[in-house]
Amino acid sequence: MMSESNKQQAVNKLTEIVANFTAMISTRMPDDVVDKLKQLKDAETSSMGKIIYHTMFDNMQKAIDLNRPACQDTGEIMFFVKVGSRFPLLGELQSILKQAVEEATVKAPLRHNAVEIFDEVNTGKNTGSGVPWVTWDIIPDNDDAEIEVYMAGGGCTLPGRSKVLMPSEGYEGVVKFVFENISTLAVNACPPVLVGVGIATSVETAAVLSRKAILRPIGSRHPNPKAAELELRLEEGLNRLGIGPQGLTGNSSVMGASSRHAAGSCRSHL
């Protein structure tokens, strides 16, 4: 059992860690993203595509050198939290994450993206009603905490769609829906993009699973062979669209395609 003074110290420390990490990821791309972009850059054959990739890497380096966000749209912060029921700061974790976002907003600095919809007022802190959004997975009889941070930018979120499929549409319906959205909307989402596909018994669950799928390391595959094959075929097919970096045509369209699913009575929600 923690004393009140020790608990407050732990709260302050965890808040600082999450705030620093959130500020840091706005300036530095994950290693798997950088490695994949290098791979796509080396494989690019169009002169315009090569110029754009060169500009991307120049921008990423300047973000590190200047300690400033790599993109002006730092998005709304989302957390995916897997936490044990015996984690000592479970009761304080929601407020810790909120405070961490407000501190990261100043540290980075992050663009103020939290606007109270009906009041039409920007809170100026990247926090507000339902922001930061937190998705919880509570693990019984466990005292660990795993926190994943996702910056939901307006551009990269643009192709996000949900749809109820008829059971008879099957895998083909999933593929068709993904292609329709990427081919028409990804051009405005700063491609090459990461595609996350969630398949579940409700559109709400599918949407959450699609976000979680994006957090998987690039190049990793679903443990189910059929799902892994679906991911591979989506990636190969989408790249044949030739959307190219920043949508100006090129050899690739996506960095990868990942999927997650939940068991259900039919394959009808995406």
Curated annotation (Swiss-Prot):
What EC identifiers does the entry list? 4.2.1.32
Report the transmembrane regions from the record: none
Q: Where is this region: Disordered?
A: 249-270
Q: Does the keyword Lyase apply?
A: yes
Its required cofactor(s), as named, are: iron-sulfur cluster
Top-level taxonomic group = Bacteria
Arranged from A to Z, the UniProt key words for this protein are: 4Fe-4S, Iron, Iron-sulfur, Lyase, Metal-binding
One term of GO molecular function: metal ion binding
Enzymatic reactions: (2R,3R)-tartrate = oxaloacetate + H2O
Top-rank EC class of the record's enzyme: lyase
Where does the chain bind iron-sulfur cluster? 71, 190, 266
**PANTHER family in alphabetical order:** FUMARATE HYDRATASE-RELATED (PTHR30389), L(+)-TARTRATE DEHYDRATASE SUBUNIT ALPHA (PTHR30389:SF19)
Q: Give the quaternary structure.
A: Tetramer of two alpha and two beta subunits.
Q: Known NCBIfam families for this protein?
A: PRK08230.1, ttdA_fumA_fumB
Q: Which family does it belong to?
A: Belongs to the class-I fumarase family.
Q: What is this protein called?
A: L(+)-tartrate dehydratase subunit alpha
Please give the organism: Shigella flexneri
